[in-house]
From Swiss-Prot:
It catalyses: (S)-dihydroorotate + a quinone = orotate + a quinol. This is Dihydroorotate dehydrogenase (quinone). Catalyzes the conversion of dihydroorotate to orotate with quinone as electron acceptor. Signal peptide: none annotated. Its EC number is 1.3.5.2. The keyword Nucleotide-binding does not apply. CDD domains: DHOD_2_like. Its cofactor is FMN. The gene is pyrD. GO terms for cellular component: cytoplasm; plasma membrane. Pfam families: DHO_dh. It comes from Bordetella pertussis (strain Tohama I / ATCC BAA-589 / NCTC 13251). GO terms for biological process: 'de novo' pyrimidine nucleobase biosynthetic process; 'de novo' UMP biosynthetic process. Keywords: Cell membrane, Flavoprotein, FMN, Membrane, Oxidoreductase, Pyrimidine biosynthesis.
Length: 349
């Protein structure tokens, strides 16, 4: 365990000398190699016990991997064995698509932030499902979330068709499914967070889920991932709509379009969503507002800007039942997982 944890700080300067997306791919490849060689397989069992329940699912601990790091579900076991209590992969779209032109990912180290405009680059639903089926994660009793989106060339008026295809495809292979309507990098996608649009989409998804539950004889929870750049009125509208359509969870939040915290830094004016430290306070606001409106009706997963165990605890104190990591892993490495698990285990005593 210590070899892997000490290796990342040593490797980080070399990784940060690379283009951000290239470094991401190199890191995943090396992590997969470490897993295949057995170097990470004890990490999962090295974490303290911090049992939690999320959307009716039993978690070993409430620290999860956020979607986006493994878009194609090709590294589920390697990533999960870093000590996560649950793993979410995707976003996957019905058809393969290349995403936006490169370069499309930028580091802002002084702000512990990233800007990305990846645009749901992925290999498509069939390849995604094949990767998920090869994983041993769920067969070990671990929790896997599958995140679905719409293709860039699907008109927003027909977005529901893509989500329905995605839901039907991933349903048999998921412990929960996340509906991503908050990426800023797919044109007009965030319009689906609006009251009428959201209600119409979720109504269709709930109807399809009921049919799938009957077909597969099991209930798979549905979560919705929302943006941090919402007004109080928009948050309140979402909080009213989610339980009405039987939604089990809400993931708060995706990346922000705000640039206040990174203004003047290199790459700050690049198009795309900001993740990392600048999102922490924004997501806390959304979590607190959601919890005050939802009560216990819908589970909240807190994500955005967690770079320490303390910040994971702040997400939980704001009203989250679980947290997810992504950008913090890039800046802190795999040691962040254990730090967050320990902080939450201590806080639950």
């Amino acid at each position: 365990m210590s070899i892997l944890f000490h290796a990342y700080p040593l490797a980080r300067p070399a990784l940060f000398a690379m283009d951000a997306e290239t470094a991401h791919e190199v890191t995943l490849a090396q992590l997969q190699r470490a897993y295949d060689c057995g170097l990470t397989r004890k990490l999962l069992h090295a974490q303290p016990e911090a049992p939690a329940t999320l959307m009716g699912l039993s978690l070993r601990n409430p620290v999860g991997l956020a979607a986006g790091l493994d878009k194609n579900g090709a590294h589920i076991d390697a990533l999960g064995n870093l000590g996560f209590g649950f793993v979410e992969v995707g976003t996957v779209t019905p058809r393969a698509q290349p995403g936006n032109p490169k370069p499309r990912m930028f580091r802002l180290p002084r702000a512990n932030a990233l800007i990305n405009r990846l645009g749901f680059n992925n290999q498509g639903l069939d390849a995604f499902i094949a990767n998920v089926q090869r994983s041993q994660w769920r067969s070990q009793g671990r929790i896997l979330g599958l995140n679905i989106g719409k293709n860039a060339d699907t008109p927003i008026e027909r977005a529901a068709e893509d989500y329905l295809i995605g839901l039907a495809g991933v349903y048999p292979h998921a412990d929960y499914v996340t509906v991503n309507i908050s990426s800023p990098n797919t044109k007009n996608l965030r319009a689906l967070q609006g009251g009428d649009e959201l209600s119409a989409l979720l109504g269709q998804l709930q109807e399809r889920r009921l049919a799938l539950a009957d077909q597969h004889q099991r209930h798979v929870p549905l979560a919705v991932k929302i943006a941090p750049d919402l007004s109080d009125d928009q948050i309140d509208a979402i909080a009213e709509i989610l339980p009405r359509h039987g939604i089990d969870g809400v993931i708060a939040t995706n990346t922000t379009l705000a640039r206040d915290a990174v203004q003047g830094l290199p790459h700050a004016e690049e198009a795309g969503g900001v993740s990392g430290a600048p999102v922490h306070e924004l997501s806390l606001r959304v979590i607190e507002r959601l919890r005050s409106r939802l009560g216990d009706a819908v589970a909240i997963i807190g994500v955005g800007g967690i770079l320490s165990g303390r910040q994971a605890s702040e997400k939980m104190a704001a009203g989250a039942q679980a947290v997810q990591l992504y950008t913090g892993l890039i800046y802190r490495g795999p040691a962040l997982v254990g730090e967050c698990v320990r902080a939450l285990a201590q806080g639950s005593r």
